[in-house]
Amino acid sequence: MSQMQIKSILLPTDFSENANHAIKYATSLARQFSASIICLHVIEPILPSVGYTGLTEPLPMPDLSEQLEDSAAEELPKVVGCKAFSNLVVEEIIAHGDASTEIVRVAKDRGVDLIVIASHGRTGLGRILFGSTAESVVRHASCPVLVVKPEQANES
């Protein structure tokens, strides 16, 4: 069996604390294999809520979409600019669509060798209501996927 070669790693981020912990795994592997990293943030479609009374005046959808785009464009360089990424080749991508679908698409289009993704560790009703992006990526990706669970993140 030939030695495993990892030249490119896809690191999806939603800017959460869990996603930040996956950085340790991705950057460590990138250093070990002299691999590049693609740091990806996916902006999911906004579905207007019906009957939500938390806002006195709802934001118009184009304004909210623009805010999400601006926020991602501001946050992604901050993530990639952290010390963990020093001396690594890193590309930033912002995509639009369903998170798991876009992660799998970018991985395939870019020919990445490994996806390192954080799991939020939801179970029960939370998982039913919100789904599992990591689980969907594992099921549909054509390359290996390393899932960093919240417990693993806290141990490292």
Regions found by a protein language model. Give the residues of each.
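Gly/Ser-rich helix-loop-strand patches that form or flank binding pockets
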Residues: 105-156
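Small/aliphatic-rich secondary-structure junction motif
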Residues: 2-58
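Short beta->alpha linker loops
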Residues: 71, 94-98, 120
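A short acidic, glycine-rich active-site loop
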Residues: 58-74
